[in-house]
Each structure stands twice: as structure tokens, then as C-alpha cells.
A protein has these predicted regions:
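Beta->alpha loop/short-helix hinge microenvironment recognizer with preference
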Residues: 1-198
Length: 198
């Protein structure tokens, strides 16, 4: 689940609160939809890892989730999913977006949010409504893919995000007093590596 970049300034000013909201909304979305018999009718296992940067080291708030391909029914029986992806991406997207923006709006109404200069205008209720309405109209893009030859490989893939630094020494190409140049993967699989200077 990736949050639109329009949220970045507000999230940055409210990291603990809004990272927590992201965790909550991801879990609730997956659990609520999984419990629906249309999709699974059971409670799956879920692992979530918050990630706050991308290959270019930009602030890019998103949640990696691993969800089991089945779960426990209310009768404590194991139920397997019928297909590869048992919840359609558009259903996940719409449920998550509605949940996140609704709870974010509740935080706003209850004066729980901090505002810095980068998002200070949102303190004005008219600005807030306009900003929020634009986020509702924007298409949010959750990304779903099949595991890599089994659950163990998915855990290994996720582990690379949780047990490494943002950039390894082997990626650093040059360092000057003012800049660092490093190589990053292509944005899509199969694209060549890129050089980025910060």
C-alpha cells in the first residue's frame, strides 16, 4: 500500500501518528475483506513492514504486506484461497483509501494533527476540505504480486528491507564535499541501473 506523495508533508510532521494509522488501515482493510465470504471467509496471517524511502532515497511512505493464502474460519477450520489473489486490487484500493482518509479526517476534526510550514495551510478548514477532496478523486495504486516460489522467499525478500541500510557502500560511485553519486535499480524489472546524484 503506497500513500500518495501529496500526504508526505503532513505525514512527516506527524510520523508516529500517521505511520500508526497506515499500519492500522492496512491491517483492517486486509482482515475485513478477508473475513468476507466473497473473498475468503477466514482470518489470514499478515506480516506488515513500513518502508519510508525509495531507490532514489526520496521520502516514499508505503507498507509491504505478506498475507497468507488462506486462514482460519470462525469455526476454527483452515480455508485456502481459491486463486492466486483472492481480493481484487480495485476492492483493496477503494476500501483502503476510504478508510485512511476517513480516519485522517477524524484526526483533523479532533485537533490531533501537527502542521509545519510545508502543510500549514491545511489548518484552514476550507483548504483541508479541498485537499482531502482531491485525494479522494486521485487514484491510489496498491501493488499486488504473487510470492516468489513460496512463502520463505517472500520473507527473505521482505527481510532485505528490514535488515539493511538505505544505501550500501557497493552502490556508492563517488563522493565529493557536496554530492554523493550512487547506482540504483531501474524503476521497473529489466530496466538498466541508473546513476543518481544527491
Amino acid at each position: 500500500f503506497t500513500l500518495p506523495h501529496e500526504l508526505n508533508p503532513l505525514i512527516y510532521c506527524n510520523q508516529k501518528l500517521l505511520y500508526g494509522l497506515l499500519h492500522r488501515c492496512c491491517a483492517e482493510t486486509l482482515l475485513e475483506l478477508s473475513s468476507d465470504k466473497t473473498y475468503l471467509g477466514a482470518t489470514p496471517g499478515i506480516i506488515q513492514v513500513l518502508h519510508t524511502w525509495n531507490q532514489e532515497l526520496d521520502y516514499h511512505v508505503h507498507m509491504h504486506c505478506i498475507i497468507s493464502g488462506g486462514g482460519l474460519t470462525k469455526a476454527h477450520k483452515i480455508r485456502r484461497s481459491a486463486g492466486k489473489f483472492f481480493i481484487p486490487v480495485h476492492v483493496l484500493r477503494d476500501k483502503f483509501k476510504g478508510k485512511y482518509l476517513s480516519l485522517l479526517n477524524t484526526l483533523y476534526k479532533n485537533n490531533k494533527l501537527n502542521f509545519s510550514s510545508s502543510c500549514e495551510r491545511l489548518q484552514n478548514s476550507y483548504e483541508w476540505k479541498d485537499w482531502k477532496d482531491k485525494l479522494y478523486k486521485k487514484e491510489w495504486c496498491p501493488y499486488i504480486k504473487e510470492t516468489f516460489n513460496g512463502f520463505g522467499n517472500a520473507i527473505e525478500y521482505l527481510g532485505r528491507y528490514t535488515h539493511k541500510i538505505a544505501i550500501s557502500n557497493s552502490c556508492i560511485l563517488s563522493v565529493t564535499e557536496n554530492e554523493v553519486t550512487f547506482s540504483a535499480r531501474g524503476k521497473k524489472p529489466g530496466e538498466p541501473k541508473r546513476q543518481i546524484t544527491l
